[in-house]
């Protein structure tokens, strides 16, 4: 049984608030680039970029990162398939840029650590911040998000499901028992 945490409108409000926080913390959007972690992080990054364009009247580049090659927890049942090795599709240089890494859910921190490794293999950004729609706790590594849409404390037998219209045909966040 799933419990709805956010509907489409609440999710839109959270992303808008995160966008304002990004602008405020960075005193504008100079040298800012967004990098979404596949799959849902890419769509969330694009939505933040669209909102930045509306608010600041400037384009912010959006790239995507597939970190499956870098994961150190392949023994996990959810990654039982052979990993797909894809190049990072940034389309821009991250050297001396302020990178906002975007993902849907922050859990153990392992995906983010892997994404940081991948980014550092690509180039040397001036700064990296982390934006996540949901922080569910249970960190295994010392990683913290700078911009959070919603903190959702969870039990280990629960799962946070983020839905984006581009992939799932709807927007929303649900909490499910495993």
Swiss-Prot record:
Segments carrying motif PRPP-binding: 99-111
Cell wall biogenesis/degradation recorded as keyword: no
CDD domains cross-referenced by the UniProt entry: PRTases_typeI
Alphabetic keyword roster: Glycosyltransferase, RNA-binding, Transcription, Transcription regulation, Transcription termination, Transferase
The reaction(s) this protein catalyses: UMP + diphosphate = 5-phospho-alpha-D-ribose 1-diphosphate + uracil
Enzyme class, UniProt record, top EC level: transferase
Pfam families from the UniProt entry: Pribosyltran
A biological-process GO annotation: DNA-templated transcription termination
Gene3D superfamilies: 3.40.50.2020
Any GO MF annotation of the entry: RNA binding
EC number: 2.4.2.9
Keyword Transferase: yes
Subunit text: Homodimer and homohexamer; in equilibrium.
Role description: Regulates transcriptional attenuation of the pyrimidine nucleotide (pyr) operon by binding in a uridine-dependent manner to specific sites on pyr mRNA. This disrupts an antiterminator hairpin in the RNA and favors formation of a downstream transcription terminator, leading to a reduced expression of downstream genes. Also displays a weak uracil phosphoribosyltransferase activity which is not physiologically significant.
Recorded family membership: Belongs to the purine/pyrimidine phosphoribosyltransferase family. PyrR subfamily.
HAMAP family: PyrR
Protein name (Swiss-Prot/TrEMBL): Bifunctional protein PyrR
């Amino acid at each position: 049984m799933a419990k709805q945490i956010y509907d489409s409108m609440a999710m839109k409000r959270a992303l808008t608030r995160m966008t304002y926080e990004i602008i405020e913390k960075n005193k504008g959007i100079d040298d800012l680039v967004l990098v979404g972690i596949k799959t849902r992080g890419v769509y969330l990054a694009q939505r933040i970029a669209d909102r930045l364009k509306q608010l600041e009247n400037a384009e912010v580049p959006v790239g995507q990162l597939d970190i499956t090659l870098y994961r150190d927890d392949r023994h996990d049942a959810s990654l039982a398939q052979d990993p797909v090795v894809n190049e990072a599709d940034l389309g821009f240089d991250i050297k001396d840029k302020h990178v906002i890494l975007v993902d849907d859910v922050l859990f153990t921190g392992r995906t983010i650590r892997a994404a940081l490794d991948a980014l550092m293999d690509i180039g040397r950004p001036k700064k990296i911040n982390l934006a996540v729609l949901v922080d569910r706790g249970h960190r295994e590594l010392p990683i913290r998000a700078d911009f959070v849409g919603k903190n959702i404390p969870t039990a280990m037998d629960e799962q946070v499901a983020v839905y984006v219209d581009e992939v799932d045909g709807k927007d929303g966040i649900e909490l499910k028992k495993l």
